[in-house]
């Protein structure tokens, strides 16, 4: 690489759009297929393309850790976010595919893992989860009711997992999905 080694690649492309969701007063037949394609393009190809570019340097140096950001929405169908959930599920599949592809063809120094954040309160989703007065929206209340930690995560709470996956402390870990969600995925009523 022109700028030195590339030891870690974090593929964090992500996003959704209203037209790729199914609003409460709509049905799946109202889903805008072009909007879903755009969401898949952003989330899936926003992971595939950087990998294809940066993995070449990792192959040459025989080491590197690729971490793909998936989502809780990939693990269980969440209401309204059909396109986003499908795209992030594909990111998990891509992660598992690349784990074998790289390790078998280029050696054990190349690792690929994914992280599935749960509901983290960020600027991107704040308007969906909080009212202007700071109280929780009905959707947010439902999420919190199904999260054993009874709160949203903070973006900084992903850092420990990312640091571990990027480091040699996880050098025998590849093809895995680490869920960071306060117990949301594991909890049922």
Task: Give the location of each predicted region.
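Conserved mid-core segment of classical short-chain dehydrogenase/reductases
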Residues: 16-37, 60, 80-83
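Active-site helix of classical SDR
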Residues: 51, 87, 95
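A glycine/serine/threonine-rich, flexible loop-to-helix segment
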Residues: 23-26, 105-106, 119-146, 187-189
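Short C-terminal tail/terminal secondary-structure segment
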Residues: 76, 162-163, 174-189
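Residue(s) in the substrate-gating loop at a strand-loop-helix junction
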Residues: 71
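Catalytic Tyr-X3-Lys loop
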Residues: 7, 29-48, 63, 67, ...
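Short, small/polar-rich loop/turn modules that mediate ligand/substrate recognition or access, typified
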Residues: 106, 111, 173-175
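Amphipathic alpha-helical dimer-interface segment in Rossmann-like NAD(P)H-dependent oxidoreductases
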Residues: 38-60, 99-100, 104, 167
């Amino acid at each position: 690489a022109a700028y030195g080694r590339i030891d870690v690649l974090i593929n964090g492309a992500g996003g959704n759009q209203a037209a790729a969701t199914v609003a409460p007063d709509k049905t799946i037949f109202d889903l805008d297929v072009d909007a879903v394609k755009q969401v898949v393009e952003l989330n899936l190809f926003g992971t595939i393309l950087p990998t294809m570019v940066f993995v070449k340097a990792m192959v040459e140096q025989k080491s590197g850790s690729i971490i793909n950001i998936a989502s809780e929405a990939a693990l269980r169908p969440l209401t309204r976010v059909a396109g986003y959930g499908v795209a992030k599920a594909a990111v998990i599949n891509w992660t598992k595919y690349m784990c074998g592809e790289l390790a078998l063809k280029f050696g054990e120094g190349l690792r690929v893992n994914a992280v599935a954040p749960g509901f983290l309160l960020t600027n991107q989703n704040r308007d969906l989860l909080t009212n202007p007065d700071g109280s929780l929206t009905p959707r947010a209340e439902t999420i919190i009711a199904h999260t054993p930690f009874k709160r949203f995560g903070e973006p900084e709470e992903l850092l420990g997992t990312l640091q571990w996956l990027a480091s040699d402390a996880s050098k025998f870990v590849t093809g895995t999905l680490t869920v960071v969600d306060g117990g949301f995925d594991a909890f049922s009523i």
